[in-house]
Amino acid sequence: MKSIFSFFLLIFLLPGCSDTSLPPIKISDFENDTSVKNLGMRLMDLPYGLNSMEPSLAEVQEIFISVHGGNSEGYEWIYPLKKINTKLRHMYFYRWPDNSCFQNPVKKLKDEITSILNQDKSIKKISLIGHSYGGILVTQLLKDWNLSTPIEIHVIASPLLGTPMLNSMCAYEPISAIPKKSVLYEWRTQFQLDNVFKNLNEDPQRIELNGSLVTTLPDTYKGNRLGHNWSISWVADEAF
C-alpha cells in the first residue's frame, strides 16, 4: 500500500467474503478444536447488526461489544473474545458493512444499545472495543452520546486522526471531546511495525484528545512482531 488511496481502498472499502452454509457462531464454539481461521470465517459470517455471542445470565452487569475493522477475516478476534469474557459481561459482536462509510452503522449500533438498556435495567456499564476502522465507528458514538449508563471505549490500532480519503468520502471529523460518564482508551501500535500504517506519510493514530488515555504497544507479543492484528490479543491480556 503505497498511498493514502490504496490504504483506504484496501483496508476500508473491500467487501469481506462469507460462507452462508456455516451456522451462527457463539463463544462456546471457541472451545472446539476448530482452526482459528475457520472460527474467524464463521464470526464474519454473522449477519449485520449486534450479535449476541452467548446466553444472557442473571448476574450480567455489563454489555461488551466488539467492533471489527475493514476487511477483517475474524481470526484476530477469537482469542481476545474468549479472554475478555466473564460471567458479569454479556459479549456481543457488531457486524457492519465496513466497505462503506460509518454514519449509518453508528446510528444503528446506538439504537441497538438503547434497545438493550431499555429491556434490561440491570446493566450498569457499556464497554466497546473497536479495531482499526472499527475504532472510528465506536468513537463516533461519543459525539451525540446522551445515555446515562457509563460507557468505556477501547480503540486499537485505529486511524482516529483520519486520512484525506476518509475525510472527503465520508466527511469524517474526529471527536473533539469526551462526554461525562465516558472513558476512552487508545491503544496504539508502533508506526514502523504496523504494516497497515507504516507506508503512510504520518501515523494516523496520533491525535490529541484531551482526557484520552493513550498506551503505545511494545515491539513483540509472545515472540511475534506486534503489528496490526496481534494488537487486539495484547490488549485483551493487558487491559482485561
PLM segments and residue spans:
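Alpha-helical and His/Cys-centered functional microenvironments
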Residues: 72, 135, 232
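Classical Sec-dependent N-terminal signal peptides that target proteins to the secretory pathway
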Residues: 2-19
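Active-site catalytic motif of lipid deacylating hydrolases and related acyltransferases
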Residues: 17-124
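Serine-dependent carboxylesterase/thioesterase catalytic core
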Residues: 64, 91-99, 103-195
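C-terminal catalytic-base region of ester-bond hydrolases, centering on the histidine
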Residues: 24, 172-240
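Glycine-rich, phosphate-binding/catalytic loops in enzymes
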Residues: 81-84, 145-146, 170-173, 203-205
